Amino acid sequence: RQRQMCIRDRDNTFGGFLSPDDKSLYYVKNDRILLEVNLTTLAEREVYRVSDDWVGYGTWVANSDCSKLVGIEIAKSDWTPLNDWQIFHDFFHKGPHCRLLRVDLRSGESQVIHEEKIWLGHPIYRPFDDHTVAFCHEGPHDLVDARMWLVNEDGSHVRKVKAHAPGESCTHEFWVPDGSALIYVSYLKGQQGRTIYRFDPESGVNEALMTMPACSHLMSNFDGTLLVGDGSGTPVDVKDTGGYSIDNDPWLYVFNVAEKRYFRVARHDTSWATVANSRQVTHPHPSFTPDDSAILFSSDKDGKPAVYIAKLPAHPSMLSA
């Protein structure tokens, strides 16, 4: 059964998430108001409101038990709606005043964790460890100093995950859902392929797992034994698109980390276009179903952005990395 949760304009396209008990939906409205929707009654409760001098930015992410979240706010005086990739590039050079904060989902109380005059994004609690928060220095991947950072929840011990090598870009970091590692993708100027890396937050060691076709986004199953990625073309979020030119790839891939092999699942055939002033609604952002039997992804292959499920083949044709 399909139900529409909200009917008004300016709802955050990506920020919605469900509570673990499936009783509540949380989302951000107008870049400012965090709302909780009761999925039984559809009643809305305002959890948190961004102050007038700030604007809520990007995706806000809850901890494992959904008792609090981390998010990014940008000073209103620096804010520009990021409606296309040229504005994305220009905004990086502005050096906007940003702050990483946490919000209690019950009381609505907030606390600033980290603050800089640099573009911050992609905040993520480490699963099952509220003490550790990942965030990024946002912007064109070939211009940022170092993309991935960790900070303790109390604001102490800010540390970078990886120092970039010359010509290296790193992107789309995520925590393995069991909290064991941070996984990300590295790619080098002038090369078609990409390398999947694993960062151990306890030891601080970065380990190259395997090479892969050029994918825009990666996600793993619960324990990180399988990864899924969406084949892509030349990245739009770099300054030197000529130096990072790659062939377009319309496939969804699953990667077996232990075997260092992978297989194709299905074509996503998305256009990667900006739609309704949103830069990412056509991006596949694939993920596994809870039982690892299928892939959930987005595409506009049939005209408008929609969500699809592709079942994993029973006998896949494995390819070597």
Q: Which role fits each region the language model picked out?
A:
Residues 2-7:
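Short, small-residue-biased leader/transition segments that mark boundaries at the very start
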Residues 20-21, 64-65, 127-129, 177-178, ...:
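Residue-level detector of Asp-centered blade-edge/turn motifs that repeat once per structural unit
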Residues 25, 69, 132-133, 181-183, ...:
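Hydrophobic beta-strand positions that form the internal "hydrophobic ladder"
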Residues 71-95, 136-145, 187-189, 229-249:
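Short, conserved, GDST-rich strand-edge loop motifs in beta-rich repeat architectures
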Residues 282-321:
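Blade-level signature of beta-propeller repeat domains, shared across WD40, Kelch, NHL, RCC1
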